[in-house]
Every structure is written in C-alpha cells, then in structure tokens.
C-alpha cells in the first residue's frame, strides 16, 4: 500500500539525518505543502466514497507520527549543537585572567596633589572657594586699581559688571581672612580663568596660592618657605632667588626663580609681603600683623618637572601623552 511505503521511506531517511540542513530538506519532502504525505491526500478523489474516511484517517495518523518523529530529531540535533557550542566555550580556570585597564592620574592633578602635600606638611591648611567671584573679592580687596590691565574685558571673563570667572585664587585668601582671625597659614588650589591661549598659556588653568599671616613675619620667612618647597618639589639641588617685581596686593613684590640642573634659572611663581591695604580691607591691623603671599601656576610647575614644552598638551586628551607621566 502506498501509505506504508511513504511511512517506511520517511522513517528510514529521518534516522540518517545528522544536521539542520538535512532536517529542513526532509520537512519539505514529506511535510511540506507539496510533500509526499500531503500528496497522499490527493488520492482520496480516486477512492470509492466508502473507503475515503478510513484512508483519510490513516494519512492523518501518518502525518502525526512523522511530525512527532521530526520534532524528536530536531530536539536531538539541537542538543548536539548546544553541546558542541559549550565545548568550544569551555573555560580553563587555570588560565590567568585579562588585566583590567585602570585610569591614570593626569600630570597636572599629580603635581597639584604633590604641592598640597608639601605645604600641608609645613603646617598650611587647604582652603577652596567659588570660581565665580565678585569684582570686590577678585580685585578691589586685593588693592588692584581700576586702571590695572587685569580688570580689562580683554583679559578677564566677565559674567556681569560685578561678577567674573576668578583670575586667580587670591579671593579665597580674602574670604578666609574675613572669616578667621590671625594667625593663619593657608593654600588655595583651584581653577582660574584668563583670556589667553598659546604654547605657554591656557584660558583655564590651575593655581595654588599661599598666605601666611602672623606677627613679625618677614621676607626671610617667605624665602625659607619657598626654598623648602623647591627642594621638596624639584630635588635637593634646587636653589631659589627673588627678583624685585610689582603686584598690587604685595609690597615688596618678587618674581621667584628656581635653579635646576641642566636648565639654569627658571621663573616659577610670584610672591611678596602682603600690602597693608589688603589687611585694612579685611579688618586686620597692619601695625600688629604681617604676612607673605605667593602664587604659582600648576601647569607651569608640571612643565618644569616633566620637561613639557607646550602647555596645550595638558588639554589635548592624547592618551599616549597622558599615560607617560
């Protein structure tokens, strides 16, 4: 009988199938719309009416049987494929794991933290303040006259007539003196802003400024502090010299140079004795208190420490550069 022949052929072929492609070909050949089992139903029209029910039932039973065997074979092949995949993904727990890439400290941050550690070890407190300042804190209280070029819009970033991005961290010293009674010894690290951009200047850079107020302080105390800083930052061979200069908030004022082997004398910061007018602006009696102040650009110190010639390298986000320090 034709039904038995199709059944035998289907079971025999199904038993030999070993992959998904062969299984799909089998499905089309026997279970598809034009497959052999569907073709058996076309014989109904050639049978006597009384035989058709039994024949149709037999064909449907065959389809159900082959579909069941087909599904079992599909699951069998699926299990084999999953097992093969697991074998390929087998983990050798004895193999050393891949090292995770960790972040790297920016050279400016490293130098700023080193500066802070040096001055903290010398008894200075670290104090921070707002980056948006009033003109009074940024200029007036620091004895900066109206005609001074630093107050010009071409040099500073003004937000309103009375507010600007601070041009130095000295306003932190003003705020601290208004809040505390002397003696005080502080450093104020942070970002500052000026309208300048070239190989040695950035519109946003970092400063650390220091202030020490006590009775009977002199230039000798200032020089000792800066010599100690230079020695710890640049090594035992570092020497310091003071050159006369002018800053509105100190009198006398100095440019400070450091001598480094292989480089000679290099300017690193500005300093001086606090001007009596600054003390008067914060309510300190200049007849009783004296003080010295200093300020340095962190990028400048980093350039000297690491031999960097272009300050713009610090903001170019070149991983090769950043990971070198």
Curated annotation (Swiss-Prot):
Q: Which reaction is the catalytic activity of this chain?
A: tRNA(Phe) + L-phenylalanine + ATP = L-phenylalanyl-tRNA(Phe) + AMP + diphosphate + H(+)
List UniProt keywords, sorted A-Z: Aminoacyl-tRNA synthetase, ATP-binding, Cytoplasm, Ligase, Magnesium, Metal-binding, Nucleotide-binding, Protein biosynthesis
Which cofactors, by name? Mg(2+)
Q: Where is the signal peptide?
A: none
- A Pfam family: Phe_tRNA-synt_N
Which top-rank group of organisms is this from?
A: Bacteria
Judged by the first EC level, this protein's enzyme class is ligase
One annotated GO molecular function is: phenylalanine-tRNA ligase activity
For this protein, the record's InterPro entries field holds: aa-tRNA-synth_II, aa-tRNA-synth_II/BPL/LPL, Phe-tRNA-synth_IIc_asu, Phe-tRNA_ligase_II_N, Phe_tRNA_ligase_alpha1_bac, Phenylalanyl-tRNA_Synthase, tRNA-bd_arm
UniProt-listed Enzyme Commission number(s): 6.1.1.20
Task: Recite the UniProt cofactor note for this protein.
Answer: Binds 2 magnesium ions per tetramer.
| SUPFAM superfamilies (UniProt xref) | Class II aaRS and biotin synthetases, tRNA-binding arm
Residues the entry annotates as binding Mg(2+): 251
Compartments, as annotated in UniProt: Cytoplasm
Q: How does it assemble?
A: Tetramer of two alpha and two beta subunits.
The protein's matches in PANTHER family, at most eight in alphabetical order, are given as: PHENYLALANINE--TRNA LIGASE, MITOCHONDRIAL, PHENYLALANYL-TRNA SYNTHETASE
Family label? Belongs to the class-II aminoacyl-tRNA synthetase family. Phe-tRNA synthetase alpha subunit type 1 subfamily.
Q: What protein name applies here?
A: Phenylalanine--tRNA ligase alpha subunit
Give the species: Thermotoga petrophila (strain ATCC BAA-488 / DSM 13995 / JCM 10881 / RKU-1)
Q: What is the lineage of its organism?
A: Bacteria, Thermotogati, Thermotogota, Thermotogae, Thermotogales
């Amino acid at each position: 009988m034709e039904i038995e022949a199709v059944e035998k052929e289907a079971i025999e072929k199904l038993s030999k199938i070993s992959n998904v492609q062969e299984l799909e070909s089998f499905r089309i050949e026997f279970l598809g719309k034009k497959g052999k089992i569907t073709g058996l139903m076309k014989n109904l029209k050639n049978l006597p009416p009384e035989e058709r029910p039994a024949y149709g039932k037999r064909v449907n039973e065959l389809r159900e049987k082959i579909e069941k065997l087909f599904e079992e074979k599909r699951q069998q092949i699926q299990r084999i494929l999953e097992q093969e995949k697991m074998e390929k993904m087998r983990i050798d727990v004895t193999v050393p794991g891949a090292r995770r890439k960790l972040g790297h400290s920016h050279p400016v941050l490293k130098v700023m933290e080193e500066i802070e550690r040096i001055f903290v070890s010398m008894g200075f407190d670290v104090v921070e303040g707002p980056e948006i300042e009033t003109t009074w804190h940024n200029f007036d209280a620091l004895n900066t006259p109206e005609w001074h070029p630093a107050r010009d819009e071409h040099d500073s970033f003004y937000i309103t007539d009375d507010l600007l991005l601070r041009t130095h961290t000295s306003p932190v010293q003003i705020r601290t003196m208004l809040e505390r009674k002397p003696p005080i010894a502080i450093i104020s690290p942070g970002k500052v802003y000026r309208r300048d951009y070239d190989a040695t200047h950035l519109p946003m850079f970092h400063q650390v400024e220091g202030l020490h107020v006590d009775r009977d302080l002199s230039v000798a105390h200032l020089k000792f502090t800066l010599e100690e800083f230079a020695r710890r930052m640049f090594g035992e061979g570092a020497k310091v010299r003071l050159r006369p200069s002018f800053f509105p908030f100190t009198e006398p004022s100095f440019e400070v140079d450091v001598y480094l082997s292989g480089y000679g004398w290099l300017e690193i910061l500005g300093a001086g004795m606090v001007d009596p007018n600054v003390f008067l602006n914060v309510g300190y009696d200049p007849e009783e208190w004296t003080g010295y102040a200093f300020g340095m650009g962190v990028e400048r110190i980093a350039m000297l420490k690491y031999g960097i010639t272009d300050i713009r390298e610090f903001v170019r986000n070149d991983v090769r550069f950043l990971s070198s320090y």
